[in-house]
């Protein structure tokens, strides 16, 4: 790994986020929240992929593949003797998963993903035999079958040598499953619609209630908690859909995101929120020293000028490392200035991560620090 390029990645990530985290503008409710109960549901199943060109499971190491094939053949009226274990290379046991979209009706197709369970080299060219897809309640909601589309490529020699491009053991089947059972209607029998924010924020909830009341009349919406807004609605499904169509396009300005720093300790990437500030502090990390100081200046207007006395903060950041020159920064004490100071002296990403953690423990970093 070229460590000399890492400081520039740190700085680029910090500057990029500061550019992204601009003051919040008006956004639609449909971009900030989802309607309660309107969501997808996970489906999972097990099946067999056949027709592989010698790239299937090594059945001596995956006996369940043979057992599954015997069971399938038995259901089709073909009896395989119990003491016979066919050694096949064109069959693979697979897991199937999909998402049942909201309001899906019987007969509608959905996409599925097929993944090898055992030691198949590649699923390219294979066909999935009919397999049921079940929900968390154990009920069958869809039936899957079709020809796989595999983006990767894999091959294996007799001596065990192997070459692969991308991931050939996973494929997709567009419209590969047919919905057989519909989910219960979430719109039936209630006089309220609930809107759940994607992120918990009391300010956004308050502003959403105000925006809805302004558009539909006072008392239409009420805040339930930091995530949920309840909206009065008619019980007729058609009228509720019309209300939602108008409701999801109401615009409001969401609250500011909380001050947060996200650090990836493995790659050295640091993402800094716009509102992150650092209190005065001095840090010594090995041969690296970072000093933060803050001075208070008072601006006194002239007599009879009508002006007001103003207090301004002037911050100074310096970073030194053994054998390196000193760097000095003027202005507000923001975290991206510390990142710049640390990068200028050529510190490794691990140094910056350790400094951020120490600042948080000392109470000098007034933001949430998340290490991923």
From Swiss-Prot:
Assembles around the rod to form the L-ring and probably protects the motor/basal body from shearing forces during rotation. One of its GO terms (molecular function) is structural molecule activity. The basal body constitutes a major portion of the flagellar organelle and consists of four rings (L,P,S, and M) mounted on a central rod. NCBIfam families: PRK05303.1. It comes from the Bacteria. Its main location: periplasm. It is found in: Periplasm; Bacterial flagellum basal body. This is Flagellar P-ring protein. InterPro entries: Flag_FlgI. Residues 1-26 form the signal peptide. GO terms for cellular component: bacterial-type flagellum basal body, distal rod, P ring; outer membrane-bounded periplasmic space. GO terms for biological process: bacterial-type flagellum-dependent cell motility. Keywords: Bacterial flagellum, Periplasm, Signal. It comes from Xanthomonas euvesicatoria pv. vesicatoria (strain 85-10).
């Amino acid at each position: 790994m070229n460590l000399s390029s890492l400081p520039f990645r740190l700085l680029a990530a910090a500057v990029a986020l500061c550019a992204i985290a601009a003051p919040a503008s008006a956004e639609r409710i449909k971009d900030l929240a989802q309607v309660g109960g309107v969501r997808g549901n996970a489906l999972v199943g097990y099946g067999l992929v056949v027709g592989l060109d010698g790239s299937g499971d090594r059945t001596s190491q995956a006996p369940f593949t043979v057992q599954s094939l015997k069971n399938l053949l038995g259901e089709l009226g073909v009896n395989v003797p119990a003491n016979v274990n066919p050694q096949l290379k064109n069959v693979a046991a697979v897991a199937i998963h999909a998402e049942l979209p909201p309001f899906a009706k019987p007969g509608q197709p959905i996409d599925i993903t097929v993944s090898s369970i055992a030691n198949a080299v590649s699923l390219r060219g294979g066909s999935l035999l009919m397999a049921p897809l079940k929900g968390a309640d154990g009920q069958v909601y869809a039936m899957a079958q079709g020809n796989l589309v595999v983006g990767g490529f894999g091959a294996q020699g007799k001596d065990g040598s192997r070459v692969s491009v991308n991931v050939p053991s996973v494929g997709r089947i567009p419209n590969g499953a047919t919905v057989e059972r519909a989910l219960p209607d979430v719109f039936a029998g209630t006089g309220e619609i609930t809107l759940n924010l994607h992120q918990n924020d009391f300010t956004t909830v308050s502003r959403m209630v105000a925006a809805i009341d302004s558009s539909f009349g006072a008392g239409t919406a009420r805040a339930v908690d930091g995530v949920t807004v309840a909206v009065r609605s008619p019980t007729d499904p058609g009228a509720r859909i019309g209300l939602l169509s108008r409701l999801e396009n109401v615009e409001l300005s969401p609250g500011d995101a909380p001050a947060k720093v996200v650090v990836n300790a493995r790659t050295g990437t640091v993402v800094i929120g716009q509102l992150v500030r650092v209190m005065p502090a001095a840090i010594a990390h090995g041969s690296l020293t970072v000093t933060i100081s803050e001075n208070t200046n008072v601006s006194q207007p002239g007599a009879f000028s009508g002006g007001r006395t103003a207090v301004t903060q002037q911050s100074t950041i310096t970073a030194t490392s053994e054998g390196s020159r000193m760097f000095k920064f003027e202005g507000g004490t923001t975290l991206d200035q510390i990142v710049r100071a640390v990068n200028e002296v050529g510190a490794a990403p691990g140094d910056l991560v350790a400094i951020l953690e120490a600042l948080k423990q000392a109470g000098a970093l007034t933001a949430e620090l998340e290490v991923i």
